[in-house]
Amino acid sequence: MAETLREHDTYDLYRRGVELLEDASFSEATVPLAEAARRAPEKSSVREALGRAYFRNRQFAEAAAEFEAVVETHPVNDFAQFCLGRALSLSGERERARHHLALAANLRPDREDYRLYRDRLRAAS
């Protein structure tokens, strides 16, 4: 019973964080999402949402850490690979960023935005 209640509370935190994220309240979204991630670090949906909130709040190193946690368990998650690459690039880790942007573009060759960021980073070196 206690575990079910905890899962429910964690889901409520996640939903509240996503609502704030969708309302462009990025800083505020990090609070419930960080708590949800603390309670359920294995939930990639929570970690991805927290990464998005950090990214939109220009906390690129924190965003990279969250997206890295997602790709460690889901390496074919093209969106997480892309976001990790962008966060690394914006936090100055361009070499690592190239790898993840290339992976994202290879996983989803139909995504023009993935190719665009990959190619821009290649050209900048």
What are these regions (language model features)?
Residues D23-E35, N57-A69, S91-L103:
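Structural signature of tandem alpha-helical TPR/SEL1-like repeats
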Residues M1-R6, T10, R98-S125:
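Terminal, low-structured helical/coil segments at or just beyond the last alpha-helical repeat
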Residues E7-R39:
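Alpha-helical segment of the N-proximal tetratricopeptide repeat
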